[in-house]
């Protein structure tokens, strides 16, 4: 899920102002939240949140949130949140949420970007990510974190996030194995995949 605003996007405020009070973000213990708020002219705020959650059964209600807000002149706010949820067994309810909110609060010549990507896999047995998959995800995380220093234009930032999203999908499609299998060879778990939910 993507939310982007530039200067002059005050119309968004009327719809979303209540979603992100200045300086606050409500998060449950298993939520993944990136929040970037800037109120300094010419300033820049960047926040990146990354989470890999695993659970057996129960209620799958993890939330992945990217909140960005700016109230200044010539400033930038960028929030990026990536969350992977691996669920084994038979959950009683599957209702994850993915949310991207970008607020331009009477901001002149500013850019506000929120990017949220959530990946949920429900399988009938316990699985793990192979060593190769973990290395790939570690590189995805580092690549996304590096965007803070690179500070690319909005269009390039979006393409970078999309590219990393594709890499995560590839890992989840090819690098999940049964936890009982000592081999590092990926299992064909398609037959056991009960639910495949990606939001972003």
Regions found by a protein language model. Name each.
Residues 11-20:
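Bacterial N-terminal signal peptides
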